[in-house]
From Swiss-Prot:
Reported function: Part of a membrane-bound complex that couples electron transfer with translocation of ions across the membrane. Required to maintain the reduced state of SoxR.
Quaternary structure (record): The complex is composed of six subunits: RsxA, RsxB, RsxC, RsxD, RsxE and RsxG.
Pfam families: Rnf-Nqr
GO biological process: electron transport chain
Main localization category: membrane
Assigned keywords, A-Z: Cell inner membrane, Cell membrane, Electron transport, Membrane, Translocase, Transmembrane, Transmembrane helix, Transport
InterPro entries: Ion_transpt_RnfA/RsxA, NqrDE/RnfAE, NqrDE/RnfAE_oxidrdctase
Membrane topology: Multi-pass membrane protein
Protein name as it appears in the record: Ion-translocating oxidoreductase complex subunit A
Organism: Escherichia coli O1:K1 / APEC
Subcellular location: Cell inner membrane
Length: 193
């Protein structure tokens, strides 16, 4: 049980996918202008990353390894992610049309989010079992969502702040992301994996 807690805390805070591994930067910068959109994208990404981790582990363990087709791993995982994203898109469209309109093009772009593919590939490379894979996918997504929501809240405050003209827009956003990354480095000694 302690191992699973350490995996969760380590993935969310210490080895955050956005601020430490630099995966998922496109939606991190693109969808984080409004808190509402960032929260919706975080929830959708959490669902996709968790489900994609589970499906990728199952396909790798039950199909690719027994048939000695591990060279098709990346292609198979991309296809799995595409199917999971389409399923998520249908669910979001039915349950929350407002969120579906807010996310716009970013929802299908979860397919190309390198964090989703990264979590599937890292699960295999780290040798996780089924429960660890599911938890790792969920933890990575929680860390991604946490950083997105924090960053969106900061960006909303910066939008009304008195920022010097050369730093407005993406410049201050990148500086803020760098400062967030430094803040998360404070967790680096918390968990040793």
């Amino acid at each position: 049980m302690t191992d699973y807690l350490l995996l969760f805390v380590g993935t969310v805070l210490v080895n955050n996918f956005v601020l430490v591994k630099f995966l998922g930067l496109c939606p991190f910068m693109g969808v984080s202008k409004k808190l509402e959109t960032a929260m919706g994208m975080g929830l959708a990404t959490t669902f996709v990353m968790t489900l994609a981790s589970i499906c990728a582990w199952l396909i790798d363990t039950w199909i690719l390894i027994p048939l000695n087709l591990i060279y098709l791993r990346t292609m198979a995982f991309i296809l799995v992610i595409a199917v999971v994203v389409q399923f998520t898109e249908m669910v979001v469209r039915k349950t929350s049309p407002v969120l579906y309109r807010l996310l716009g093009i970013f929802l299908p772009l979860i397919t190309t989010n390198c964090a989703v593919l990264g979590v599937a590939l890292l699960n295999i490379n780290l040798g996780h079992n089924f429960l660890q894979s599911a938890l790792y996918g969920f933890s990575a997504a929680v860390g991604f969502s946490l950083v997105m929501v924090l960053f969106a809240a900061i960006r909303e405050r910066l939008a009304v702040a008195d920022v010097p003209a050369p730093f407005r827009g993406n410049a201050i956003a990148l500086i803020t992301a760098g400062l967030m990354s430094l803040a998360f480095m404070g967790f680096s000694g918390l968990v040793k994996l």
